[in-house]
Amino acid sequence: MDPRKVNELRAFVKMCKQDPSVLHTEEMRFLREWVESMGGKVPPATQKAKSEENTKEEKPDSKKVEEDLKADEPSSEESDLEIDKEGVIEPDTDAPQEMGDENAEITEEMMDQANDKKVAAIEALNDGELQKAIDLFTDAIKLNPRLAILYAKRASVFVKLQKPNAAIRDCDRAIEINPDSAQPYKWRGKAHRLLGHWEEAAHDLALACKLDYDEDASAMLKEVQPRAQKIAEHRRKYERKREEREIKERIERVKKAREEHERAQREEEARRQSGAQYGSFPGGFPGGMPGNFPGGMPGMGGGMPGMAGMPGLNEILSDPEVLAAMQDPEVMVAFQDVAQNPANMSKYQSNPKVMNLISKLSAKFGGQA
């Protein structure tokens, strides 16, 4: 299973433990039913949650929701993280050092010369002549650019010169050549420690000790590891907070969508009821209707008073097609127009919906006249 999904689920479960009312929302019904079907028991909702579930909820204040979400966000990643930065230095910005031509053909003579340069560089290093050691290691690298130990040795001098970025470049090159050597990881770990890169330092120093245990690397690992762990815990904390915010936002979106759907249903129901009232022969039929309609049918609006005894009325109102036409605003507007002025029927000769209703009513009333 995707670890990210597992983390999201863990954050959701934690949120449910803190606020069981989340489980009593309508969209979480499926989860409640599943828990209960497995023999589990869902904690009761708070009184507030119950009242919200049983009454129509007001539309949530989106600004308040946004403010609540922002309140959970840290002002910065370092907002409540305090790390001892003793020994951390500013990064060096020198131009990259010479790395030699890795595609050059290396002769045995060049290898011997490179070894001589390496020996001289180590002597200079032991004498404290650090820059001389750098120059000699560089000469050795140019003679034999595919020997990982030369880069690792030069990196150790860069660390002593407090040039951690230069040391990291040398260690990266040494690891490319021989990833199983402990020395490049040791010196890269020390360089990262100088820069305050605690997690990277802990990773490299631990790997160096794993490949070839070194007391010096182990001592520095013990120094940086607590800081690296503190940073990792800090990151996990805010990842959990972010996941909890995402879950809250999803629940809020579902809640808003449900409210929008319910509001749309209420509006549709109101429109349907309004249409039903509108389709009840408003305004009567003054002056009679052509086609054998009886001479005027006044008083038909608002429930058609006075027509209860009209022959055939119940049959007309039970006809599905007539009822459907009475629900159509276009048909009823035309019907009113013709009722007020029968001569206007000619305007609707080409409208089958209007003519169909008039024909049906004419037939019904004509049969009773």
Curated annotation (Swiss-Prot):
Bias kind Basic and acidic residues: ranges: 49-73, 256-272
Residue numbers bearing the N6-acetyllysine modification: K353, K360
Biased composition (Gly residues): 281-300
Modified residues (Phosphoserine): S346
Stretch list, region Disordered: 38-97, 256-300
Annotated Pfam families: HipN (PF18253), STI1-HOP_DP (PF17830), TPR_8 (PF13181)
Domain of life: Eukaryota
The protein, known as: Hsc70-interacting protein
This protein's encoding gene: ST13
